[in-house]
């Protein structure tokens, strides 16, 4: 039996019943795709994920990649490569890719819904399969000549990496020292060592790998502004035919031993260090590396958040299945009666609390990433939200740190509830949840730690944006609060949501006040740092509560229209999750607001020796 448990029903509900993404299908850019086809695609990829892709999940963990320092190569477990080939054979690595690169255009919301299944079943499989998506980013940023190379890479299914991190330049990317030296023929020789590079070698999955490398040209200034982006292929190739040539001077020199996500080869990558120059080409022939790389980074952050959410969802569904079957103890109302019948643990109050917590967060987080994705296509944003492309881009930028930061922190935390549901059995490798937890911890670390996400959220996505995107989302929440959808049956939930919105707005005002005060007292900026992660998490809870309540309003309409059977149970679950979240999670934001409003610098003024 597969460890992975999909939830296509919830995806379809979000896409078509709540957000109305079907409005854009069958016309213009998406003329070849209708709602029925979209449903079939979701069902088909869920079947593939539960079968061939999930099959090697455990094998890849127990038998991680083997590095050969003599050949600088990585050997992957055979079962995992079989899973990858099943993914490639179905063309699933090209979902959402531009038509001129061999893909099928589709709304980003549908694309991410499809990807959720791969990430939930075997997350490393999607990471190895990111080549076509990276090819499109290279195509969009490249010169006319480089667009040809990107097309070759997509057509031939090459692998790809994003190469930023160095031993002394992690979150501080601008401290990178990898050097680029221009050659007389216009190419560049890249010299340096990079660290924590995902999929820098991948056995025989790909005939070539294109590395997108941040490096500092000789004479360039310090910090991120001095960095440029270079295309550095593993093998040289014929620029017209794509035929593979000689080895380029970029070699894997180590593979990390990790807590989880083991089958994903996390590599040290040395450039120009082994007697062969690492030849690269300046992407777009412009020195604009960090801005170009942010196209890749934003894609990666969306992926990480979706991965975390997918893992929590399957963790919850595994816990639910176990709880429905595990018989232990009597019902609490009969706990003093030693002759009372034994019941399944779903009868116990704390198990129900835990399961509903998992359900509410798993489904709330799914709603957040899909809501975010509806702003990633101008056509969808216009049809679904009535906003123009500029505002859509701003809202997407605002929400990405929520998807990544809030999603990764929350999924990891609530997966412990999934494990707890299984009791001691959850601690065993007989069940998948302990691996889910190990595999998901990385999500709050790579592609920008949660603190980085929180500061990006506050400084760039709110302050620099002058609050435009935040005001739009707050306005949407206010409109829902005032709406009477549900015939008054969500009155309490709306009142709790209104309080939560006011609490979040109060937090934003306090943090802005600390920022303004820093103009006179520089140390005041510390308070922003002390409060920003809590603020990010609070906004995530607010969005979860709102989107769950929106779902409940739709569910009430469906029940009033006579839904029966499995649909009736599904909609009743939606109302229950929204009500539970509003009553149990949203009130906690009031205390968070009080904490942020009363922040001081005591912890910053404490001597380091006292820690």
From Swiss-Prot:
The active site is at residue 447. Keywords: FAD, Fatty acid metabolism, Flavoprotein, Lipid metabolism, Oxidoreductase. InterPro entries: Acyl-CoA_dh-like_C_dom (IPR025878), Acyl-CoA_DH_N_bac (IPR020953), Acyl-CoA_Oxase/DH_mid-dom (IPR006091), AcylCo_DH-like_C (IPR036250), AcylCo_DH/oxidase_C (IPR009075), AcylCoA_DH/oxidase_NM_dom_sf (IPR009100), Diverse_Acyl-CoA_DH (IPR052166). FAD binds at residues 162-165, 171, 198, 326, 420-424, 449. GO terms for molecular function: long-chain fatty acyl-CoA dehydrogenase activity; medium-chain fatty acyl-CoA dehydrogenase activity; short-chain fatty acyl-CoA dehydrogenase activity. Its cofactor is FAD. Disruption phenotype: Disruption of the gene does not affect the growth rate, but mutant shows decreased resistance to ethambutol and streptomycin. Pfam families: Acyl-CoA_dh_1 (PF00441), Acyl-CoA_dh_C (PF12806), Acyl-CoA_dh_M (PF02770), AcylCoA_DH_N (PF12418). Signal peptide: none annotated. Transmembrane segments: none annotated. It catalyses: a long-chain 2,3-saturated fatty acyl-CoA + oxidized [electron-transfer flavoprotein] + H(+) = a long-chain (2E)-enoyl-CoA + reduced [electron-transfer flavoprotein]; a medium-chain 2,3-saturated fatty acyl-CoA + oxidized [electron-transfer flavoprotein] + H(+) = a medium-chain (2E)-enoyl-CoA + reduced [electron-transfer flavoprotein]; a short-chain 2,3-saturated fatty acyl-CoA + oxidized [electron-transfer flavoprotein] + H(+) = a short-chain (2E)-enoyl-CoA + reduced [electron-transfer flavoprotein]; octadecanoyl-CoA + oxidized [electron-transfer flavoprotein] + H(+) = (2E)-octadecenoyl-CoA + reduced [electron-transfer flavoprotein]. GO terms for cellular component: plasma membrane. Disulfide bonds: none annotated. It is an enzyme of class 1 (oxidoreductase). Acyl-CoA dehydrogenase that exhibits broad specificity for linear acyl-CoA substrates, with a preference for long-chain substrates. This is Broad-specificity linear acyl-CoA dehydrogenase FadE5. It comes from Mycolicibacterium smegmatis (strain ATCC 700084 / mc(2)155) (Mycobacterium smegmatis). The lineage of its organism: Bacteria, Bacillati, Actinomycetota, Actinomycetes, Mycobacteriales. The gene is fadE5.
